[in-house]
Amino acid sequence: MFKKKGDIMRIILTILAFFAFNVNADGHASDESKDNAYMLLSTYEIAPGQNPADLEKELAQLQLDQESYGFNDCGLYRHWYGGQRAFYAYCFFTDFDQFEAIRIKSDADDDRMAITQNYSGHTDHILHVQKANLKEAPTNLLWMKWEFGPYLTVAEKQERADKLFDAFNRSFGACNLYFHSWGPEIAHYIDCGFENFSDFGKKHDAINKILAEELATAKLDILDHSDDLLILIQD
C-alpha cells in the first residue's frame, strides 16, 4: 500500500539481491497491472515528541514531487492501529528504465535535499505487484506482511501466499498481492480496503469463517506475520 531527515537518524536500506518471482506456483504468469508492475514502498517512523502533522505535511509534498519526477501514481497513508507508528508512502512504476529516468530527474532537483529531516527511521522496499484487484486507494487499508519458512522453495512460498491471498480477497472483495523484489526482507504483502469498522467487522467474520473451514488444518509454514490498519492521507 507510500524526504527525509530527526535526532536519531537510522536509515535502513539493506538491499537483498533476489530475483523477482514473476510466476505463480501453478506456472502461469501473474496478472499484475501492465502499467504498475512495481511499487516503491517507503516507511517513515514518527519520532518521539514530534508533531505528526509536521511530518505529514512534508511527506504529502514529497509524494507530489515524486509524481512530478515521473512515477505513475503516488500516495500516502498514516498509521492507525498496528505495530509501527509511521507514515507509509507508495509510488507505482512500470519498469527500471522508468525508475532510472525518475532518479535522474530527482537528482537534478536542487530543492530536494534542502529540507530538515523530521522522522526517526526510514525503510525502502521495491515490491513486485503480483495481483492488482484494488482499482483505487481505499480510505482505510489493512496492510499485511507474510514471511514463510526459509526451508521452503520460492514456488512453495508463493503457493502459500496465493492461498492466503485467495482467502482475504474473497473476504474483503478486492485485495492486492505483492512480493519482495528489493529491500530489507523477503516477504509477501497483501493489502485490502474497508469502509469503516462496521464494514471491517463483517469482513473480519468472513475471513475467520474461511480460515476455520478451509485453512485450519492447512500447512502454511508462516514464520512471521504482521497486520497494520492505515488511513489514507493523500492519493
Q: What is each model feature region?
A:
Residues 11-21:
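Sec-dependent N-terminal signal peptides
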Residues 1-8:
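Short, Lys/Arg-enriched N-terminal segments with co-localized hydrophobic residues
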